Amino acid sequence: MLVMAGIVSAQAANKYDNPDTLFVARDGTAEFRNIDDAIEVCRAFMEYHKVIFVKKGLYKEKLIIPSWLTNIEICGEDAENTIITYDDHANVFIPGTNRKMGTFRTYTVRVDGNDITFKNITIENNAARLGQAVALNTQGDRLVFVNCRILGNQDTVYTGGVNTRVFFKDCHIEGTTDFIF
């Protein structure tokens, strides 16, 4: 009976230690240094669950989870110290043009895929107060955010997908004007 208990607790301790888990660490101690690189290797329209475990660190990335990616869980080591950040705002010019970004291109994270979960992570747009600056843009369906911090100033979370469902549990969402729209 003791052997059985040891096996069960070893399995519980290695929750993310399986072939369907990718590891990200900014300091280079994992197979990926950037979250975007881990997202890029995920297969389109997966029928199985894929976990991307992100170790503590500051990840300055503008992430898009495209519509063809499904069944992905992005899990941070802890919400306070696992941070995805970017600093675009509505008055930044689109590279190579004389047009400004406007609100909807300023996201730090844009989720177009369905059945995507974020846990224990901070998503922030840390742009100065120079205009709208979206931290999270949700377009996919059945999106789940658990124990996440979503931080910004104006227009922090955009839930603009038509006929989509987004669930926030034990999350802290912070902003100023229209911080959830």
Question: Which sequence ranges carry the predicted segments?
Answer:
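Short, internal active-site loops enriched in acidic
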Residues: 57-60, 143
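Short aromatic-glycine-(Arg/Gly/Cys) micro-motifs in beta-strand/loop hairpins
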Residues: 11-24
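Short, T/G/N/S-enriched strand-turn elements that build extracellular solenoid repeat scaffolds
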Residues: 33-44, 59-68, 74, 84, ...
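Acidic Gly/Asp/Thr-rich repetitive segments characteristic of extracellular carbohydrate-active
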Residues: 22-53
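Bacterial Sec-dependent N-terminal signal peptides
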Residues: 1-14
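Right-handed parallel beta-helix
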Residues: 109-181
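Active-site-proximal beta-strand/loop segments in catalytic clefts of secreted hydrolases
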Residues: 27, 55-57, 171
